[in-house]
Amino acid sequence: MVTRDVVAQGTFDILHPGHVHYLREAKAMGDRLHVIVARSENVTHKAPPVVPDRQRVEMVEALDPVDYARLGHAEDIFVPIEQIEPDVIALGYDQHHEVEGIETALDERGLDCEVRRAGPRKASEDEILSTGSIIEKILDERS
């Protein structure tokens, strides 16, 4: 029996239902889900995480869809992908990475891997599906 390994990645600063949705969709793309949690110093496209690196890994690892969680490499985001050798890389619907750019980088490294994008989760009326929005709400309500 062939096992399909899937990689998901992200910051996962303050966990919310959007993260769970992404990880469930990623898990459905294969048999084993490996999650690479971005190191704080590598998060440059948005505000740095509030929650420490190891704590974010521990929280992600505790989620049902996740089989393995690890901290990303300090200098090269593709090192863990080379170690895992996944069949699929699952991108979140709102992640800033472009599928074509990831595919090109994988080809350059000799990695044969499908790149797919998970779909969005529609928020219910009272749901907050963004870490930034959660932080803003906390600041508004606790000030």
From Swiss-Prot:
Binding site for ATP: T11, F12, H16, P17, G18, H19, D94
Pathway listed: Cofactor biosynthesis; FAD biosynthesis; FAD from FMN: step 1/1
Necessary cofactors: a divalent metal cation
Transmembrane segments: none
Enzyme class: transferase
UniProt-recorded Gene Ontology molecular function terms: ATP binding; FMN adenylyltransferase activity
Disulphide bonds in the chain: none
EC number: 2.7.7.2
Reaction it catalyzes: FMN + ATP + H(+) = FAD + diphosphate
InterPro entries documented for this protein: Archaeal_FAD_synthase, Cyt_trans-like, FAD_synth_RibL, Rossmann-like_a/b/a_fold
Keywords annotated in UniProt: ATP-binding, FAD, Flavoprotein, FMN, Nucleotide-binding, Nucleotidyltransferase, Transferase
Keyword Acyltransferase carried by entry: no
Protein's UniProt keywords contain Transmembrane helix: no
GO biological process, one term: FMN metabolic process
NCBIfam families: cyt_tran_rel
Subunit structure as annotated in this protein's UniProt entry: Homodimer.
Similarity comment: Belongs to the archaeal FAD synthase family.
Protein function: Catalyzes the transfer of the AMP portion of ATP to flavin mononucleotide (FMN) to produce flavin adenine dinucleotide (FAD) coenzyme.
Protein name: FAD synthase
Organism: Halomicrobium mukohataei (strain ATCC 700874 / DSM 12286 / JCM 9738 / NCIMB 13541)
